[in-house]
From Swiss-Prot:
GO molecular function, one term: tRNA binding
A GO term from the CC aspect: cytosol
Disulfide bond positions: none
InterPro entries: aa-tRNA-synt_IIb, aa-tRNA-synth_II, aa-tRNA-synth_II/BPL/LPL, Anticodon-bd, Anticodon-bd_dom_sf, Beta-grasp_dom_sf, TGS, TGS-like
Species this protein is from: Photorhabdus laumondii subsp. laumondii (strain DSM 15139 / CIP 105565 / TT01)
NCBIfam families tied to this protein: thrS (TIGR00418)
Domain spans labelled TGS: 1-61
UniProt-recorded name of the protein: Threonine--tRNA ligase
Designated gene of the protein: thrS
Ranges that cross the membrane: none
Length: 642
């Protein structure tokens, strides 16, 4: 006689085993209709799962995050159902959920076209609208294998042979004549899977191994209702308009080419943004009392073996050799900073020592994972390492947190999700060290009024960490900032200082990054602002245009005056209509366009327009420069008169 306890504390008693769906029906028809799955004693299960002993139960609906994930997973099965109807010889591989959707890897024997994708989506919708029940069967390993051997599903057979124990009872989900294998849970009926969209097809190696066959990965998105789907598709459309690769080309910021995959060729305007970003960060380094250093581009492989990087990260490192020595191009800056720390005797009075670098790093990322500036092989880290005592951890972490929020607020990022990752099962250091470290990080966050969530067991083996994930205007998440404690690396590389009692002690090292990678952060900013960079960081801040040749000298004089004031300005003296010039520079997102005609020459003023189309009228030149300099120096996000 199971007693089922619901989330509100109420209980229902049954005189026999009941399914999750039975309990939902007992509560009411509305909940039964909405029931997708259940959470029994904390574990997600199918709606058909039997409860035969006392249990805690939460009914999962499409309003729950878990419910939406289940809908997406079932849409992957729906895709499999449709593709096997259209192309029966297709071999199905894996079909997991991902952020906002799902994919399925398939072996079709030919490349899918856009027409194929449209046909596939149409068939999926036809099947979903039949509102058929999804039937789950738990079978023994041999029956599952026989099922997929008979169906010619080689990849499913391989999964069974290599990844599933002979003692397991795999779950087979029956979608009419189509059968798929999955841990589940899945929707009980396809009425939950009406709102989806297939998005794209890409290549993917079986099991992610380039030695295996290349499969086709079909991506899709799925939502609980039509409104959610349309909202997401509109967001995707807006994201496509803001794509930093597209805008980077339009604004002539940078380019990539095959001869240097994952490494940017910065053009003048893009490099201007890069240098402005560096200058801004340098002001913060000075404000927060950091030294700026520069380590070597590469070091002997022996160094990376000592740090443990070669063993754990070697496949992602570029190497070269000279005079029978093997060198590794650095993927990160920390070992170099410890070498600088080790030069000369250090006392506890020298700590904390804050060391920052705009380090040029390289990582051998897979070519298929490269994506504009967001995923590169060559990048610049705004990296810093703080060497301190255990007693100084709290204060230093608190300072790092302040710096992170200080920087992000300058760019207008307000939604920042913070996570504190705590000790993993396998770790170094004493329990006392971990207790103090975790308490110091949590206290520093609380001291700064930062809301955060714990990620138990997700810290590195050498120390806990804080992750800062900023959300952009489209609510996309970008993990940028980190504050990571390290009890291991300083000791591995023989870093030490003399304590108060003249004993040798190993410093704690705090790894700290704010922007992460400058390249990636510029990509994020490009998409956040859609290329409308705040004036202080805009590559061209002002363009001055003449209407006829008679204003050319006045324009040149004005440009020189602007440049002498430290404003990035240029002249446009082309023999084109003024409307054409304005349209062109508007498309180039130049913050201010100054128009000079006879009236302006006579009055010594300028006619000012913004890139958003606002006409600020005729303004005194000196007054305009004064206001513009205030906007630039304050790093204001808004333009004059906005």
């Amino acid at each position: 006689m199971p007693v089922v306890t619901l989330p509100d504390g109420s209980q229902r008693q049954f005189d026999h085993a009941v399914s999750v769906m039975d309990v939902a029906c007992d509560i009411g028809p509305g909940l039964a209709k909405a029931c997708i799955a259940g959470r029994v004693n904390g574990e997600l299960v199918d709606a058909c799962e039997l409860i035969d002993s006392d249990a805690n139960l939460a009914i999962i609906t499409s309003k729950d995050d878990a419910g939406l994930e289940i809908i997406r997973h079932s849409c992957a099965h729906l895709l499999g159902h449709a593709i096997k109807q259209l192309w029966p010889d297709t071999k199905m591989a894996i079909g997991p959920i991902i952020d906002n959707g799902f994919y399925y890897d398939v072996d079709l024997g030919r490349a899918l076209t856009q027409e194929d994708i449209e046909l596939l989506e149409k068939r999926m919708l036809e099947l979903a609208k039949k509102d058929y029940d999804v039937i789950k069967k738990k079978v023994n390993w041999q029956e599952a294998r026989d099922t997929f051997v008979a169906r010619g599903e080689d990849y499913k057979v391989q999964i069974l042979d290599e990844n599933i124990s002979r003692d397991d009872r795999p779950g087979l989900y029956n979608h009419e004549e189509y059968i798929d294998m999955c841990r589940g849970p899945h929707v009980p009926n396809m009425r939950f899977c009406h709102h989806f969209k297939l998005q794209k097809v890409a290549g993917a190696y079986w099991r992610g191994d380039s030695n295996n066959k290349m499969l086709q990965r079909i991506y899709g998105t799925a939502w609980a209702d039509k409104k959610q789907l349309n909202t997401y598709l509109q967001r995707l459309e807006e994201a496509a308009k803001r794509d930093h690769r597209k805008i980077g080309k339009q604004l002539d910021l940078y380019h990539m080419q095959e001869e240097a995959p994952g490494m940017a060729f910065w053009h003048n305007d893009g490099w201007t943004i890069f240098r402005e970003l560096e200058t801004f960060v340098r002001t913060k380094l000075k404000e927060y009392q950091y030294q700026e250093v520069k380590g070597p581009f590469m070091m002997d492989r022996v160094m990376w073996e000592r740090t443990g990087h070669w063993e754990n990260y070697g496949e992602h490192m570029f190497t070269t050799s000279s005079e029978n020595r093997e060198y590794c191009v650095k993927p990160m800056n920390c070992p170099g900073h410890i070498q600088i720390f080790n030069q000369g005797l250090k006392s506890y009075r020298d700590l904390p020592l804050r060391m920052a670098e705009f380090g040029s790093c390289h990582r051998n990322e897979p070519s298929g994972a490269l994506h504009g500036l967001m995923r590169v092989r060559g990048f610049t880290q705004d990296d810093a390492h703080i060497f301190c005592t255990e007693e100084q951890i709290h204060r230093e972490v608190s300072s790092c947190i302040k710096m992170v929020y200080d920087v992000y607020s300058t760019f207008g990022f307000e939604k920042i999700v913070v996570k504190l990752s705590t000790r993993p099962e396998k770790r170094i250091g004493t329990e006392e060290q971990w207790n103090q470290a975790e308490e110091s990080l949590a206290a520093a966050l609380q001291e700064n009024g930062v809301q955060f969530e714990y990620q138990p067991g997700e810290g590195a083996f050498y120390g806990p960490k804080i992750e800062f994930t900023l959300h952009d205007c489209l609510d996309r998440a970008w993990q940028c900032g980190t504050v990571q404690l390290d009890f291991s690396l300083p000791g591995r590389l023989s870093a030490s200082y003399v304590g108060e009692n003249n004993e040798r002690k190993v410093p704690v090292m705090i790894h700290r990054a704010v922007l992460g990678s400058l390249e990636r952060f510029i990509g994020i900013l490009t998409e956040e602002y859609a290329g409308f960079f705040p004036t202080w960081i805009a590559p061209q801040q002002v363009v001055v245009m003449n209407i006829t040749d008679s204003q050319a000298d006045y324009v040149q004089e004005l440009v020189k005056k602007l440049q002498d004031a430290g404003i990035r300005a240029k002249a446009d003296l082309r023999n084109e209509k003024i409307g054409f010039k304005i349209r062109e520079h508007t498309l180039r997102r130049v913050p201010y366009m100054l128009v000079c005609g006879e009236k302006e020459v006579e009055s010594g003023k300028v006619s000012v327009r913004t890139r958003r189309g606002k006409d600020l009228g005729s303004i005194d030149v000196n007054g305009f420069i004064e206001k513009l300099l205030i906007e630039i120096r304050s790093r204001n996000l808004h333009q004059l008169e906005e």
